[in-house]
């Protein structure tokens, strides 16, 4: 039979030349060719070689042994110690607990160590997180204490005298310490065992590490593959957007909402070429290849996948505005299907519907593969073949490829051959050229939300479609759809945060200053009380607006999951409303934090503060403050209180991991009644486990404080100018019960000073005094204070004053000075003389500070004042955050390792009692009132 179209000579040549693109087949020729192909299809239907492909939903029904897949998943979960998390899923709070593991850089020894090793390293943004290598011959103290007894029970000791025949099968089924685990199997097992919020955290951290993200999660146990839309909701990316005409600018958006062309890479039957290696090469600019997709040449990459076949991964290329780095002019998504398309047809169908082009890697095109692809004849997607043909298969491949040309509407330029002699660099350039040609022509652009919509139509489960998530989303939309202008909404709906609150905060500051006066006039004190009462009565005269009432209903839900869903939806919904688009050069915007460039005026923010969840909680706090003030003054009977339950609601949010505002970023004051009420409720909920260590960070904006805390403890403090509120926030970390006695506390309360310390000079008057007071408050509440610096000698004057004031009170936290190199990852760290300079006797600034605090010549070197020894790890150099140029840069391994070492030292200091006396919550409440 004559082959339709133009004869394919490509396979005979053994290479593909993109420079010689054959003409497209005419419409009349294509109709004839397709008709011939239809005839051949019917002929093959009668062949005895019946072909069936898996649809991804009922694979077990087509299998003679339907329990094989089920047992394979169960064996993997059991091997990894995750079988107990199939009903009660592993939560984010579980994964963040401080334990023995937190203080040791131990290597996993048995498969059950692998999930925890992965989570711990991923939390620290460690590029080695995916490595599943286990080390058996290690020193005894290299393994966590709490797991030693467990390991002794698991190790199987073989006695040669035993009856081998009687026990060989049971022995081979038991997990052994050297059982290799493919990293993709580990990821799938962990995601299947995690709740929605831990899945989201895993995806967020993987994105920061520039790992490929799971998009479709296979579940061979229930034959329900899940599209992970919710898991990717929190991922924001920044890239250079260059319109065809006009000036380019940086754009920041969610990967879920932004649309981009998508290109899928799949395998049909077998392929000698690695899809993942090819994708990594295409995505990597210059000569530095980043292993975004795990591939066969990496450690344990050749291990058989037990449960991760059918996994679809996604990664993006984002332009930076630099010609030497930008492979493509716009964002591009790349998708990778693990496994053969014939066994995972549902996933393949999804990829063909969402992709602008699909690259099919195969060594063989026979009758089975032809019938498989023939069913795609109505598809409008572009198809490209990357072949590495078997010796002796040339004629078969040629015959069926010629049949597919009219069916898939392709020509010779859509077929590439890559064999061992093919130059890899040239081949990668060809792939990039194809992608570039598709981008220049009209092509479909899809967001992850669009992909999820296509997945639903095909019958895939979408994680976001659960009832609790959708109810929370509906509630969020009822609030945000009324927000047309953030400033107007704050003025009209959050009424207690206007002038009455600012005036009340000012009166309370004056009243507090009178407390320290030698002989304050009683008349002035009474006047301040009267003014404060008037302002509080004015606030109490309002009722919560409809939006605030809806918010209160959302956080009052009896379902913990619905409450957490609602808070996440509110964060994203409010961020979407704000639509902040900064216009800054790449070196400032893409570092996730502003440069340190002089002083900050606390009265005038450097950027507009976005409307956030903290504003709704602040409104609740003001209702509680006003009501409490009236009760204290005898103007309102305690039995008539309407808002007494508000602190309890807020304390529950703190326990779920939400950062709560400690110092108001608008008035730069602490709502004492609200904070103490919240801590009292926290004390009630924690019951016997209320011993606290307070750890704070202070320093000027732009020194990486929030990123440091988030990396160290897995916290959620806001980073970057566009989303950072100005106040100080606190988050609670739980210490595992088995470790709390050893560490000496049950929880660690972490305080991030945000943008409160602006580096004001002493000549700035009231502004400087305000900064010094705030620094004194934050450091005075703390057992441990991390001083974050942008320069080795750059200690803000306000912090020097706080040192002096705290020395007079006798309260001296354990200080750690952290110098962060914000730009150069190659700098090894400050030299010893640099460390000495930081703590040397003070110059003019220190002497002036001493005179203001009336300490005269008694001012000592900072080394003595802060109990620092430069040789004993009180001063830290943290390398740059990024390895490479953002937005395609990954987090530096040196940064991750330095943060881990700082964390280990902090915990060791707490454990050894070097962090001053630990507190319980009641003592912290008294300290808040006193300070």
Swiss-Prot record:
PROSITE patterns: G_VLIG. The keyword Nucleotide-binding applies. Keywords: Cell cycle, Cytoplasm, GTP-binding, Nucleotide-binding, Nucleus, Phosphoprotein. Residues 689-929 form the VLIG-type G domain. The keyword Cytoplasm applies. The modification Phosphoserine is found at residue 3. GO terms for cellular component: cytoplasm; nucleus. It is found in: Cytoplasm; Nucleus. One of its GO terms (molecular function) is GTP binding. InterPro entries: G_VLIG_dom, GTP-bd, P-loop_NTPase. May be involved in cell cycle progression through the regulation of cyclin D1 expression. Belongs to the TRAFAC class dynamin-like GTPase superfamily. Very large inducible GTPase (VLIG) family. This is Up-regulator of cell proliferation. It comes from Pongo abelii (Sumatran orangutan). The gene is URGCP.
